[in-house]
Every structure is written in structure tokens, then in C-alpha cells.
């Protein structure tokens, strides 16, 4: 996708273009990548274009997921400012990789059936469709995310009052209140 957009925007060939395929965390990782590239080079500006078309990845008859995933896009322009940094904390949770997964996604299973099947949770989908274990994602969000935010503020020697907003990537109102 990055190279397609590079062509459509008629960008110079000296302009780097690459994809970061990380789903929910792609924006945070991409912002850190752009920040690091700018801090360690003569790059003065970076354009981050994020987009998801998850409606294509969820089976329309999978009632457990179809209402949770949507499509969206945004573009953010980064500009180098002397003595200013974009700080962040990147984390991964490999133990929970099965909580949101397209079982036949990527190149893991090269010849799965494309036929929709009825799964044990009572929902219909193919092995190519994204599936989410809502209970596991909820548990992770309630247990780990607040601790990560606290750890980050300790690392940066800040408090909640330091920030104008905390913007969370979560559709669940109950989780936001936690």
C-alpha cells in the first residue's frame, strides 16, 4: 500500500515508503518509527497515513465481531522541531496472539479452505476472517493497559495532570472508565 500511495502522490524517489502491518498498534509504532528516523537523519518531515478496512476481514455472519470492526483512515504530518522529541513506550504481548487473529492470514497456512464454517462459538467465518476473543481482549485491556500507562508516566516522571488528553483505542465505554 505504501508504494501505491507513493506513486499516486507523485513523491520523489528519495522518499521512503513502507507498510507497518500491526493492526491496532500500527499508529503508535509508526509514530515512533517516524520520530526515530527524523531524530537520526536529515529528514525534516514525515507523512504517516494510517488506514484499516477491517470490514473486508470479518465474515458478515460472525455476530461476535462484525459490529466491532470498521473502516477508517487518517493522515498525520510530522515535522522536526529542534530539542523536541516524541516519546513513547512500545510493548508486545506475544502470549495473547490468538486473541485477535486471522488463522490463515499471512503465509502461515498456504492452502486453507475458503469455505465458511460454523465455529464452536456459534459464529460462521472462514480461516481468512479475523476473529477476536472478546473476553481475552477485555481482560488484557483492564489488566495490562493501565499498568503500562502508569509505568510510562513513572519513566517520564509525569502525572495524569501533565496531559491534556488520554486517547484510547477502545470501543468499550466501560473500559474507558477504568
Locate each region found by the language model.
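Glycine-rich phosphate-binding loops at beta-strand->alpha-helix junctions
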Residues: 1, 163-178
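Conserved catalytic cysteine-centered active-site region
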Residues: 1-45, 178
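Acidic-glycine-rich active-site phosphate/pyrophosphate-binding loop
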Residues: 1-11, 49-54, 114-122, 176-178
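Beta-strand segments within the central parallel beta-sheet cores of soluble alpha/beta enzyme folds
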Residues: 16-19, 43-51, 86-88, 161-167
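Acidic, glycine-rich active-site loops and adjacent beta-strand->loop/helix elements
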Residues: 22-25, 50-55, 91-93
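Flexible, glycine-rich active-site loops centered on histidine and acidic residues
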Residues: 39-73
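Condensing-enzyme catalytic core mediating Claisen C-C bond formation in acyl metabolism
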Residues: 62-139, 143, 147
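Phosphate/pyrophosphate-binding loops at sites that engage ATP/ADP/AMP, CoA/4′-phosphopantetheine
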Residues: 148-164
Amino acid at each position: 500500500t505504501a508504494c501505491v500511495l507513493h506513486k499516486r502522490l507523485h513523491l520523489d524517489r528519495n522518499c521512503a515508503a513502507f507498510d507497518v502491518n500491526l493492526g491496532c498498534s500500527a499508529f503508535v509504532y509508526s509514530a515512533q518509527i517516524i520520530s526515530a528516523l527524523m531524530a537520526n537523519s536529515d529528514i525534516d518531515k514525515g507523512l504517516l497515513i494510517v488506514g484499516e478496512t477491517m470490514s473486508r476481514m470479518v465474515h458478515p455472519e460472525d455476530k461476535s465481531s462484525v459490529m466491532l470492526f470498521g473502516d477508517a483512515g487518517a493522515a498525520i504530518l510530522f515535522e522536526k522541531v529542534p530539542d523536541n522529541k516524541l516519546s513513547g513506550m512500545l510493548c508486545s504481548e506475544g502470549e495473547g496472539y490468538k486473541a485477535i487473529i486471522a488463522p490463515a492470514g499471512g503465509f502461515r497456512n498456504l492452502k486453507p479452505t475458503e469455505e465458511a464454517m460454523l465455529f464452536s462459538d456459534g459464529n460462521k467465518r472462514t480461516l481468512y476472517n479475523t476473529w477476536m476473543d472478546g473476553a481475552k481482549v477485555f481482560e488484557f485491556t483492564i489488566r495490562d493497559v493501565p499498568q503500562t500507562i502508569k509505568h510510562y508516566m513513572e519513566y517520564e516522571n509525569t502525572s495524569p495532570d501533565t496531559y491534556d488528553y488520554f486517547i484510547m483505542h477502545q470501543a468499550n465505554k466501560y473500559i474507558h472508565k477504568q
